Design a protein with these regions (language model features):
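Beta->alpha loop/short-helix hinge microenvironment recognizer with preference
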Residues: 1-272
Length: 272
């Protein structure tokens, strides 16, 4: 669609993200649910955008050093459908989507509500060094500490256009924790790889780990069987996507999307 596309990232704080070590399916499901509810609710607020938005979310669980670092990358068209369905409501500023402070506060509150619900319903399991969190008092104290800190939501500058969005999705959606190109050497039971230190002005550094520790970190990022790491919400949700996208294009005065059969034929043809 001929609109700006924004890149919004929801990140779990370390003490909460660590719960995924023993409860990956529950924590990642709550992460999707809380981020989606946050974006949809804040965008629908008449004081903000006042529209029904749609977006695609991709789960990543790693940091550059391969430690557990759960976060969601969301690609969001800059606008949405008016409540009466008669207008496209664009962002008031082409470079600004929604206030990150408001998003972060809402995200924290919604996530912790769903997290406590999961605990109360017995859907969270703790053992080993984390066994103590199975006690209501200890778990409640963890949530109280998490409620007092800032939860980070980044809204990155808009993509250059739909073509850049497609390039981003092609590169980013199927990425794994570390690519072969970052691994410098495997020798003498050790693995040396490149990583970017965001806390030190994004400097590229090298890290050497024992092979067992490298494998342990890599295995942290294998998702539960059948878990879907790419999901669509709002007017991009699967159940109504075709109709909603057709409405969006009509409201924007944009051409209809080419049929999939035509796209497949086009990809199979050679120029000249």
């Amino acid at each position: 669609m001929p609109v700006p596309y924004f890149h919004v990232v929801f990140t779990l704080p370390q003490q909460i993200g660590g719960l995924a070590l023993q409860n990956a399916r529950e924590i990642y499901t709550i992460l999707f649910r809380a981020a989606a509810e946050t974006l949809l609710t804040i965008a629908a607020d008449p004081k903000r955008l006042g529209a029904a938005v749609g977006f695609l979310a991709v789960l990543h669980t790693w940091g550059q050093n391969l430690h557990l670092h759960p976060h969601l990358h969301c690609v969001v068209p800059g606008g949405g459908i008016s409540p009466d369905g008669d207008r496209w409501v664009g962002c008031r500023k082409q470079s600004f989507f929604l206030p990150v402070q408001v998003l972060g506060s809402r995200f924290r509150n919604v996530f912790l509500i769903y997290l406590k619900e999961a605990f109360d319903q017995g859907r969270l399991q703790f053992h080993g060094e984390m066994a103590g969190l199975g006690r209501p008092a200890a778990f409640g104290a963890l949530c109280s500490r998490a409620r007092r800190i800032k939860w980070v939501v980044h809204a990155k500058p808009p993509f250059g256009g739909p073509e850049q969005v497609l390039k981003y999705l092609a590169r980013y959606t199927h990425r794994v924790a570390i690519s072969n190109s970052r691994i410098l050497s495997i020798a003498d039971g050790k693995v040396t790889f490149l990583w970017k230190d965001y806390a030190d002005d994004n400097k590229t550094k090298t890290m050497t780990l024992d092979a067992v520790e490298f494998i342990r970190r890599f295995l942290l990022h294998i998702l539960p069987a059948g878990f879907v790491r790419i999901r669509q919400f709002g007017f991009l949700a699967n159940r109504a996507r075709r109709e909603k996208l057709a409405l969006c294009r009509a409201l924007l005065g944009a051409p209809s999307a080419a049929p999939r059969s035509a796209l497949r034929r086009g990809r199979g043809q050679k120029n000249g």
